[in-house]
Curated annotation (Swiss-Prot):
The gene is psuG. This is Pseudouridine-5'-phosphate glycosidase. One of its GO terms (biological process) is nucleobase catabolic process. It comes from Alkaliphilus metalliredigens (strain QYMF). Belongs to the pseudouridine-5'-phosphate glycosidase family. Keywords: Glycosidase, Hydrolase, Lyase, Manganese, Metal-binding. Its cofactor is Mn(2+). GO terms for cellular component: cytoplasm. InterPro entries: Indigdn_synthA-like, PsuG. Homotrimer. It comes from the Bacteria. Coiled coil: none annotated.
């Protein structure tokens, strides 16, 4: 592991937090470059960072800038990622090439988990995780996020899986790999824009202290892999199920008709759904990320107390 440090560059705030042994929360950057339009992307990222600070933890937004892995971003780097058009969506397979070619990369759930683990960060906040795409029986289009959750020791606080995916198969894959699906104050697995997906979670926890004890036990026992912390979107911002289902079905059909596949699929679908819902889906997306940031900060603080 001694060669790792030469690839990582820590923002001053994160460096100080590590030196002082303070709780840190990792954040991904795909949401900035590929998940939301400018300026909402930068505004959301800044507010999420502030919410984590208010919760007693230190935010570390992760990205790659000119081939350097950044653990925590400066304001300039954040603006650059939010506006630049030449930012690669970087998952596990992309990291070595982006570094070697000195490119700019926005980290997905998978690559953020990898970098968080290298930096010793145990809690990561995102909107939703990737999963098994609809029709994967033919295409084998399965997000690398699931394999990462199977092997990397980071807890991922999310609002479940976007219903653009096959949620049932996604949960089956996670079960096969022994990844616990934990509902935060819920028995229902959320579907990103809505509070329920029709599927349950493995366990529900009442508070972050209970969740922190479970994480500590998991990793103390050397049970490798992450945990999905499913935190439903607040009721006030949840979308109407019929409306969002119709929008998603329409977007999925258009993507198929246009032959859109691979890593282009999710950004295309999100943009299309935003159009169809007249911006309501973007508002929901922003609010669920804020809600996850709040719980993520509390969890990082609770886990830190146990160590």
């Amino acid at each position: 592991m001694k060669n790792v440090e030469k690839y990582l560059e820590y923002a001053p705030e994160v460096k100080k937090a590590i030196a002082e042994g303070r709780p840190i929360v990792a954040l991904e950057s795909t949401i900035i470059s590929h998940g939301m339009p400018y300026p909402q992307n930068v505004e959301t990222a800044k507010k999420v960072e502030d919410m984590i600070r208010e919760g007693g933890a230190v935010p570390a937004t992760i990205a790659i800038v000119k081939g350097k892995i950044k653990v925590g971003l400066t304001e300039e780097e954040l603006m650059f990622l939010g506006q630049s058009k030449d930012v690669v969506k970087a998952s596990r397979r992309d990291l070595p090439l982006i570094i070697a070619k000195e490119l700019n990369g926005a980290t997905t759930v998978a690559s953020t988990m990898i970098i968080a683990a290298l930096a010793g960060i145990k809690v990561f906040v995102t909107g939703g995780i990737g999963g098994v795409h609809r029709g994967a029986q033919e295409t084998l289009d399965i997000s690398a996020d699931l394999m990462e959750l199977a092997q990397t020791n980071v807890a991922v606080v999310c609002a479940g899986v976007k219903s653009i995916l096959d949620i049932g198969l996604t949960l089956e894959v996670l079960e096969t790999h022994g990844v616990p699906i934990v509902g935060y104050q819920t028995e229902d697995f959320p579907a990103f824009y809505t509070r329920k997906s029709g599927y349950g979670v493995d366990y529900a926890v009442a508070n972050v202290e209970e969740l922190a004890r479970a994480l500590k036990a998991k990793w103390d026992l050397d049970l490798k892999g992450g945990v999905v912390v499913a935190n439903p979107i607040p009721e006030a911002y949840a979308m109407d199920e019929a409306l969002i289902t119709q929008a998603i079905d329409e977007a999925v059909q258009e993507a198929a008709a246009k032959g859109i596949q691979g890593k282009e699929t999710t950004p295309f679908l999100l943009t299309k759904i935003k159009e169809i819902t007249e911006g309501k889906s973007l508002e929901s997306n922003i609010e669920l990320v804020f809600n996850n940031a709040k719980i993520g900060a509390e969890l990082a603080v609770a886990l830190h107390r146990l160590s």
